[in-house]
Amino acid sequence: MIIDTILLLATEAKEAAAEGFGINTDILGTNLFNLSILLGLIIFYGRKVLGQILGERQSKIAEALAEAENRKNIAATALAEEQKKLALAKQEAEKIIDNSRSRAKAVTADIAAQAELDIQRMRESAAKDLSAEQDRVLVELRQRITALALANVESQLSTGLEESVQQTLIDRSLANLGGK
């Protein structure tokens, strides 16, 4: 049906062309003429629209570039600031580590000195305890010797020693014990 309509229009156009107005069915002749008119209209009216569209696009691209540049500058500033903070933090960490090492050395030295003092004190205490024990043993031995000597003297006295001999024996025993 559409084809019939087109054919009908084409035949009427041919008849009308003979009269002066109608559709020209010569494809090569009409297409070049129509294309040149269409191209002229597009250039004349399209230039303004296309220029406006391209101008808007150019301004949007320029704004996007400016915004990107601004964000880049802000990011660079923030990066520099954070790098400074990082450097300061590293310096502070080094100070803390150095202080900790110094403190550890000082504490180690203090502990070693205190341990040495404790060892010295223990040695002195042990020496005093040993000396006191020796003194106690010596006193106990002297007391036993004295008791044995007195017992020996008493037994000899009871057997009948003379009084002058007894006195000499007592004096000698006391002198041996450190009495006189």
From Swiss-Prot:
Signal peptide: none
Pfam families: ATP-synt_B
GO terms under cellular component: plasma membrane-derived thylakoid membrane; proton-transporting ATP synthase complex
Annotated compartments: Cellular thylakoid membrane
SUPFAM superfamilies xrefs: F1F0 ATP synthase subunit B, membrane domain
Membrane topology per record: Single-pass membrane protein
Keywords attached to this entry: ATP synthesis, CF(0), Hydrogen ion transport, Ion transport, Membrane, Thylakoid, Transmembrane, Transmembrane helix, Transport
Predominant cellular place of this UniProt entry's protein: membrane
Stated name of the protein: ATP synthase subunit b
Gene designation per UniProt: atpF
GO molecular function, a single term: proton-transporting ATP synthase activity, rotational mechanism
Native source species: Microcystis aeruginosa (strain NIES-843 / IAM M-2473)
